[in-house]
Amino acid sequence: MHLSEEEDDYNLSLSKFESMLKTNKVLFFDSEEFEEIILHYLDMGKANLAKKALKLALEQHPKSTGLKLVQIEMLVYDDKLDIAEKMLNELYAIEPTNEEIFIQKANIYSKRDNHEKAVELLQEALLLTEDFADVYNLIGMEYLFMDNLEMAKESFIKCLEEDIEDQSALYNVVYCFEFLDQNVEAIEYLKKYIDKNPYSEIAWHQCGRLYYGLKDYENAVRAFEFATYIDEEFLGAFMENGKALERLKRYEDAIENYKKTIELDDPTSYALLRIGKCFEKLGNKVEALKYFNKTVHEDPLLDKGWIAITDFYVRQKNYKKALIYVNKAI
């Protein structure tokens, strides 16, 4: 109930602000309302509206540190780094324990490709913040910029210890494990993560991908299936489960998974081609050819589709038709 009230207040502030712009009447908003409005427009990619809101906000609240930090964030985004840095130094003189000042300073150094200094500043922010997850995530990104995958991995792990639901950190930690050729260790990490967060479809999906890479197709299928039980519209998990099932020669189950991807979204030439290949393995030539034709209809430029039809006719010893289709593949 509390959350819905907050959302209602937020939507009311936004509609009130947009109504003000249309009527040219100047209405009062508190500084936090303005911050939310500005950040909303930035998230929506509406920079001009964000700038209008910021101008009005600073006219009404010229001493608001929060609004000045939003202004600095926008200056950094526009690569006006020197102006942003000057403003940060002025704010630091007033509020030396504000962690956002250190985070924005780190952002400036990061933009200047001085990632070591950015990490130093973020380490200082850690001593002041209550939002450890966000800062650890930022530190992880700086280490990625420096190609220090080991330290990046440790930072993302710390981020997930603080906020187990941080999906970007989860993807990033798996990326680091993979880049470091630590696929077995990645699976062990994900198993522990899943023990704490068993309904994370992303963790199950990533686990499946890693098992697939290690050619452990049985465990890959198990992981992908858990991902699809949790999220019945997880297109990627159905697609990759189809691939793993093919490896196990479970062609009917693979077809079912590929067909699910077509139900969930527009058909892809890849899924149609794989369905055709599975039917061919099952000896169902009519369905195989039907799906190969659907493949080239969906993507006439996909040479693999034309080659599949060519191979099909070669196996039928119908070389005349095979020649027609091989020419389309070239």
Residue ranges of model-derived segments:
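Register position in tetratricopeptide repeats
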Residues: 43, 77, 111-112, 145, ...
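Canonical positions in the second alpha-helix
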Residues: 57, 90-91, 124-125, 158-159, ...
